[in-house]
């Protein structure tokens, strides 16, 4: 398994304010994925001139900000099993989020640390 991306992901009830803050810090919106899990949830990927990245998720019903690491991999199943072996649990039970461009899920460690595991679908 190869890690192909590794950046912070912030889920926030005030996502628009965070996006504005990161824009003032020099980040630009690269793309936005909408309708995640058939809900009004969207994720904005941002990048600055130095190549640093951050993702901001909006529309999720969380009372406060939740910060995790987004880890993109080339083999979702292998990474998923590795995290399970280390005590991580899928926050969606057995469900995975499937979109036209990726497979994702939030994996949570026994201490509460979150990794959003993701594999991009390549045509």
What are these regions (language model features)?
Residues 1, 39, 64, 98-100:
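Short coil/turn motifs at beta-sheet boundaries
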Residues 18-24, 83, 112:
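Conserved active-site tyrosine of GNAT-family acetyltransferases
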Residues 36, 61, 75, 97-98:
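Short beta->alpha connector loops
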